[in-house]
Amino acid sequence: MGLAAPRKKTKISHDPNNTSWSRSTDGFGHRILKAQGWTPGDFLGARNATHSDLFTTASASHIRVVLKDDTLGLGARPKRDLLDGPTGLDAFKGLLGRLNGKSDTQLEAEQQKRDDAKLARYAATKWQTVRFISGGLLVQEKDNATASPASQDLRVDFPRETSSNEHENGMFKTEPMDSYSHQEGCATAREEEGKKKKKKNKKGKEMDMSPRKSREKKQEKIQKKRKIGDCDRLDTETADRTSTKVLVAVANDKGTSLLASNGPSTSRERQPMGRRIFRSRHIEQKKRALMDDKSLNEIFMIKT
């Protein structure tokens, strides 16, 4: 009921079962029923009816009103504790069994059955629809056989970083053969993609493939597109690395004469990448100028 609903206050009367009306003999209902041949304690309806066999003593009793204070549906029984039974009933049954001449083994077997039934009822109330099933043991699976060749082709081996001695000498080692083979694979993938596009543009091609074949073909196309995208990304990364390596080599060649006087550096500095290399080059030149006595004298205009 919302806030805009009509507010109705209901009160439970002092006679909710309406026994005062049923007991009174002065009312119109009691008088008309007596006029029709009804007497107190009899059933309502014809005595020779087809459902007369279903009448019980409850049919002659009063209709009782039950207050519904829950959200259960009509006819639903409220949840009650199955273990909430009469206490001491098991011991009383055992006593009756001894009086009937049963042995102790029979009594123990019956008691065990009752205990098992009690545990089963408790489990049914505690875990209603849960069934514990053994799932076995976990076994490690071998992924080497299931690895697809497409995932193996996409493996990229980046070239290792050059050491400080190689930077000083201005020598750079070539990339390993894995990257070269990967570039060849990228080129072949591009050629295959170009051939497929040419075949697709041809007229008169029949498109009567089954849904499964078309699905497999779409998956192959997606894998090849991913492979070509990885190849393009690898090419751009290698081009950026080569450009930065050339700039580092030029900067190192300019400062080899100054570094030779101070001796070889023991600590390895991190080489900047990208647009920061130009700023780092100017910072290195300023550091070298401050380390050199002659350049300091020129800065402070001191004549020697």
Swiss-Prot record:
**Taxonomically, which superkingdom?**
Eukaryota
Which family does the similarity line name? Belongs to the PINX1 family.
Sequence ranges of Basic and acidic residues compositional bias: 154-170, 204-238
Q: What PROSITE patterns does the record tag this protein with?
A: G_PATCH
Q: What does this protein do?
A: Involved in rRNA-processing at A0, A1 and A2 sites and negatively regulates telomerase.
Q: Compositional bias (Polar residues) at which positions?
A: 15-25, 256-266
Q: Which UniProt keywords apply?
A: Nucleus, Ribosome biogenesis, rRNA processing
A GO molecular function annotation here is:
nucleic acid binding
Which protein are we looking at?
Protein pxr1
Compositional bias, Basic residues, is annotated for 1-11
Task: Name the PANTHER family on file.
Answer: G PATCH DOMAIN CONTAINING PROTEIN (PTHR23149), PROTEIN PXR1 (PTHR23149:SF31)
Q: Region (Disordered): which ranges?
A: 1-25, 144-238, 256-276
